[in-house]
Amino acid sequence: MELPLSQATLRHTLLLLPALLSSGQGELAPQIDGQTWAERALRENEHHAFTCRVAGGSATPRLAWYLDGQLQEATTSRLLSVGGDAFSGGTSTFTVTAQRSQHELNCSLQDPGSGRPANASVILNVQFKPEIAQVGAKYQEAQGPGLLVVLFALVRANPPANVTWIDQDGPVTVNASDFLVLDAQNYPWLTNHTVQLQLRSLAHNLSVVATNDVGVTSASLPAPGLLATRIEVPLLGIVVAGGLALGTLVGFSTLVACLVCRKEKKTKGPSRRPSLISSDSNNLKLNNVRLPRENMSLPSNLQLNDLTPDLRGKATERPMAQHSSRPELLEAEPGGLLTSRGFIRLPMLGYIYRVSSVSSDEIWL
C-alpha cells in the first residue's frame, strides 16, 4: 500500500512538471524563474532573488551560477526526489544586487548521466537616474538682435532621459532636442543632446533638466557674457604673453640703468687729485701727474718777497740760515735770484714763470 504524498512534495512536483515536460525524455533543462531565457529590468542597488530549477534524469543534478562569466556561490540549494530514483530534481537560489556594470546571469547545469551542459540565462537591464556628464554652450553673433546659442549636454541614463532647457524666468525654452547616441561599447548609456536657439538678452541663466522613470537631474549654465562671445583667448596664450611682456620690461629697465651708469662715469672722469710724496721736510716732490692750473700752488712756506728781484743787493743782505722755516733756494745765476730768462729754480719743483698782467703788476705761473 502506497503512502500518500505530502502537500510540500506535491507542490514542488507541480513546479517541476513544466520543466520536465518541456525538456523531453531523458534531457535536463534548467530554468530561471520558469524561463530558459529572459530579460529582467532592475534598478540600481536593487536586490532580487533568482531561482533556477531543473527536473528529470536519474542522477542528482549539479547547478552553478555565473554572473558575467564569473562563478558565484548560490544563496540556497535543495534537491528533490519523488518515488525513489524514477523522478528527481533540484532548485538553487541566487540573490543579485543590481549594478550598472552587470549584464547577464546564467544558471548552468552539468548532467551527470550524459555529461552535456545546459544553461538558462537572464539579461540584466540595470536602470538608474540621469547623470549630466558635461554641459556647455557655444555663442555666435546672430544676424538679428541677440545671440545665436548652441547648447549641448552629455547625459548618461538608463532608460534614456528626456532633456528640457529652461531659462531663468521659468518658462520652458525648448522641450525637445536632437540627441546622438555615442559609442555604446566604450560609453554605455551616454547621449549628446544638442539644441540651437536665439537669445534676445545677455542676462539669461540657462539650465538643463534630464528626467527618466528612475529620477530627475538638473544642471545650470553661466550667463553668456559679451566678452565670451567676441574674445576667445586661451589661458595658455594669456600666460605666455604676460611673461614675454614682463621679461621685455625688465630687460629694457636694465639697459637704461646701464646706460645711465656709463654716462655718469664718463662725466666724472678719472680722479685727477695729485698725490704728493714728501721726500724731505723742506722739499716736495710731485707724482707723475699733470695738475690743472687751478690745482697748482706754491709751497706753503714760500713768500713772494723771496722771489722778488733785487738787483741792488738786498738778497745778499738777507742770508738764509739753515734753521730758517723757509726752504732753501738753489743758487741763482750771477745777478740775483732771477735768471736772465725771467724765472728762478726751485728745488725739485721745476720752474715758476713770471709774466706781466694788465690787472696787476705780475702773475706767477
From Swiss-Prot:
Tissue expression profile of the protein: Expressed throughout the brain with higher levels within the hippocampus.
Spans traversing the lipid bilayer: 233-253
S-S pairs: 52-107
Gene3D superfamilies reported for this sequence: Immunoglobulins (2.60.40.10)
Signal peptide start-end: 1-26
UniProt xrefs under InterPro entries: CD80_C2-set, Ig-like_dom, Ig-like_dom_sf, Ig-like_fold, TMEM25
Pfam families xref list: C2-set_2 (PF08205)
Domain Ig-like: 30-123
Subunit structure: Interacts with GRIN2B.
Its job: In neurons, modulates the degradation of NMDA receptor GRIN2B subunit. Plays a role in the regulation of neuronal excitability.
Name used for this protein in its record: Transmembrane protein 25
Annotated organism of origin: Mus musculus (Mouse)
